[in-house]
UniProtKB/Swiss-Prot annotation:
Residues 167-174, 216-222 are mitochondrial intermembrane. The lineage of its organism: Eukaryota, Fungi, Dikarya, Ascomycota, Saccharomycotina. Residues 119-144, 190-196 are mitochondrial matrix. Essential component of the TIM23 complex, a complex that mediates the translocation of transit peptide-containing proteins across the mitochondrial inner membrane. Residues 1-25 are annotated as: Disordered. This is Mitochondrial import inner membrane translocase subunit TIM23. The chain crosses the membrane at residues 97-118, 145-166, 175-189, 197-215. It comes from Saccharomyces cerevisiae (strain ATCC 204508 / S288c). It is a multi-pass membrane protein.
Length: 222
């Protein structure tokens, strides 16, 4: 009945032990050479309780025996332009464009919304129901907030583009370049209103840039 249940016969055991040679080791060696890694899990896990794993015997494509590798990607390097170090680490003009425009837009949106709320509270009709009072305040908030936020975002977007262009042409970033970019941005923003509004806008944006540069310089020196 050994042929039915697959039991080994004495003839099989005798053939396996002919000449006192173990035929399993050559088979494992040839299999390891063909696969390129250790196929026997018993040779990988060793030590008391089988808790130690020899990573050098695992698949070579996994690279587990090389330790920790740190990637140094060029796109992750910070900007090396002279004077370009700011309050937030920046990789170039694209980061300045995104961060600067987004921050100024949110700031303008918040200030405009707060201003609209104050105006709405002052203009609430007397003896009006609660829904009308709430609607009045919300109307002023949605009117002033997006208006100031959009204008501030346009100014910041134009300023960052002009400032980055000036820095690229001069090869450095400094206060003079920022003030010049602010003056050009203000003049461009009111270019359709005439020379006098252009002058006022140019002076105001240039003054704001000068104040920002002085504040940033003080913060970086601390």
């Amino acid at each position: 009945m050994s042929w039915l249940f697959g039991d080994k016969t004495p003839t099989d055991d005798a053939n396996a032990a002919v000449g006192g040679q173990d035929t399993t080791k050559p088979k494992e060696l040839s299999l390891k050479q063909s696969l390129g890694f250790e196929p026997n899990i018993n040779n990988i896990i060793s030590g008391p309780g089988g808790m130690h794993v020899d990573t050098a015997r695992l698949h070579p494509l996994a690279g587990l025996d090389k330790g920790v590798e740190y990637l140094d990607l060029e796109e992750e390097q910070l900007s090396s332009l002279e004077g370009s170090q700011g309050l937030i680490p920046s990789r170039g003009w694209t980061d300045d464009l995104c961060y600067g425009t987004g921050a100024v837009y949110l700031l303008g949106l918040g200030i405009g919304g707060f201003s609209g709320m104050m105006q709405g509270l002052q203009n609430i009709p007397p003896n009006s129901p609660g829904k009308l009072q709430l609607n009045t305040v919300l109307n002023h908030i949605t009117k002033r907030g997006p208006f100031l936020g959009n204008n501030a975002g346009i100014l910041a977007l134009s300023y960052n583009i002009i400032n980055s262009t000036i820095d690229a042409l001069r090869g450095k970033h400094d206060t003079a370049g920022s003030i010049g970019a602010g003056a050009l941005t203000g003049a461009l923003f009111k270019s359709s209103k005439g020379l006098k509004p252009m002058g006022y806008s140019s002076a105001m944006v240039a003054a704001a840039c000068a104040v920002w540069c002085s504040v940033k310089k003080r913060l970086l020196e601390k």
